[in-house]
């Protein structure tokens, strides 16, 4: 059986809460066989079971109310793994970002599954950690799961958005004090998974990061990696239904060598194929949701000469066929 693991980064806020009130943090960590030097190992992994036991022991022994919530309050987007941040940053829409989250969530917790469920005019972003079905006090972990998902959504909505509903797999009721921080959010527990919901209309939200690229640390002259990424993302949709430029042609347009072009993309955390896939699937999902275009026409419009190849690639990326996607996501 696989041991469920989580990044040390997610236990650091719990330790910081203990430190702030003068608790014997190091002794508690050692008791549960966790590394005392967590801040030196944010990208390392530890067993979720031990992390949850540590959090519960700290809460109980120190009289802390809702330590999971207190830890989640400290969680920001930049605490996610570098690779997941890059993937989200360069997703053109929230929907693509959430699909990528479903694919790459195990970067944060090794046995977590994330998926989307349509529920009337809302979409639930669900998460569940395999191998933890009978584990007590999972609410501490599930607070982090729900809030880091919320932080991803906020990259598209702005920093003040909160979900209308937050659900916990654990049998757990937030305290009145905790609820006072979430006056516009309904809490439910004992669910099949943990989840937050977003309006279906949010799925088309564009990524503001595309318009305001982060500062680059590239050496040398010429456009930075982030400038290159922004330009390519703007340009590719124009070519999808014609001849898509090769990587050599894109490099020539940018006035740099292929090697420099690839190095700049790498510094931004993406590859040319990542950008091309993103443009293709953004175009395809928009057509499938918003029009009645035939699947074959969606394939051609998205840069595929073979509709069967399009269907296979779409299913590999999204986990459903284009036809199934349309039936599930197109507004009724």
Task: Annotate each PLM feature.
Residues 1-124:
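N-terminal low-complexity or simple alpha-helical regulatory segments
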Residues 6, 20, 137, 141, ...:
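Short, contiguous, pocket-lining structural segments
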Residues 82-87, 131-135, 215-219:
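Short hinge/gating elements
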Residues 97, 145-148, 228:
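Internal, well-ordered alpha-helical segments in soluble enzyme and binding-protein domains
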Residues 113-202:
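DNA-contacting interfaces and partner/effector-binding or oligomerization modules
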Residues 172-332:
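Extended mid-to-C-terminal alpha-helical interaction segments
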């Amino acid at each position: 059986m696989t041991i469920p693991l989580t990044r040390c980064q997610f236990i650091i806020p719990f330790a910081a809460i203990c430190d702030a009130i003068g608790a014997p943090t190091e002794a508690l960590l050692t008791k549960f066989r966790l590394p005392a030097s967590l801040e030196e190992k944010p990208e390392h992994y530890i067993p979720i079971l031990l992390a949850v036991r540590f959090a519960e022991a700290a809460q109980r022994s120190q009289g802390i109310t809702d330590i999971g919530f207190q830890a989640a309050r400290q969680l920001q987007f930049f605490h996610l793994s570098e690779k997941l941040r890059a993937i989200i940053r360069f997703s053109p829409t929230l929907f693509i970002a959430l699909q990528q989250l479903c694919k790459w969530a195990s970067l944060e917790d090794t046995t977590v599954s994330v998926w989307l469920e349509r529920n009337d005019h809302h979409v639930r972003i669900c998460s569940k950690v395999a191998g933890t079905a009978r584990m007590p006090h999972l609410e501490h972990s599930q607070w982090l799961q729900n809030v880091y998902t919320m932080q991803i959504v906020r990259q598209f909505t702005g920093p003040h958005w909160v979900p209308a509903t937050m659900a916990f797999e654990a049998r757990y009721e937030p305290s009145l004090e905790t609820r006072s921080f979430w006056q516009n959010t309904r809490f439910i527990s004992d669910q099949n998974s943990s989840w937050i919901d977003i309006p279906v209309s949010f799925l088309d939200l564009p990524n503001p990061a595309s318009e305001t690229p982060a500062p680059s640390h590239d050496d040398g002259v010429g456009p930075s990696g982030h400038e290159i990424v922004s330009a390519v993302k703007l340009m590719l949709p124009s070519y999808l239904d014609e001849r898509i430029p090769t990587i050599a042609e894109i490099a020539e347009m940018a006035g740099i060598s292929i090697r420099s072009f690839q190095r700049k993309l790498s510094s931004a955390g993406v590859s040319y194929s990542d950008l091309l896939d993103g443009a293709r699937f953004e175009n395809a999902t928009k057509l499938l949701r918003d029009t009645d275009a035939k699947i074959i026409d969606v394939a051609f419009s998205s840069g595929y000469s073979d509709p069967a190849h399009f269907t296979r690639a779409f299913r590999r990326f999204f986990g459903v066929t284009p036809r199934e996607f349309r039936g599930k996501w197109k507004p009724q």
